[in-house]
Amino acid sequence: MLKKYEALSEQVNPTKTLMAQAVINRYIKKTSLTHYSELSRLIGCEAFVKHENHNPTGSFKIRGALNFFHHMSTEELEGGILVATKGNHGLAMAWAGQWFQVPCTVVVPQDNNPEINRIIESYGAEVIVHGEDFYDA
């Protein structure tokens, strides 16, 4: 699985980006792109904001999680997924794991926001609290 994960982590490739977009669009709605005139005035060019906070888990991280799960085989996902995070990555992996019916375990540090932990659990993932910071988790 590591080799396949490394392939998903390659340098940005426009063709693969478009392929990922097609995959992601099967699972979540496109987020709005809004022109902000005041921001445009302040920075001296046209400014558009992509509202990734409107995604199911509140961030763009769900895109990577969905693309990851989509490209893994049933055998590769058989034992479930284990991730370490303080927030958005864990939320996204837990949500996508629930969608793909793959068990997900999320390791978080001791000082993690309890509300984030609760939401991760609400997506069906197991939360393990370990360590003083993200790196320990």
Predicted feature locations:
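PLP-dependent amino-acid enzyme catalytic core
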Residues: 1-137
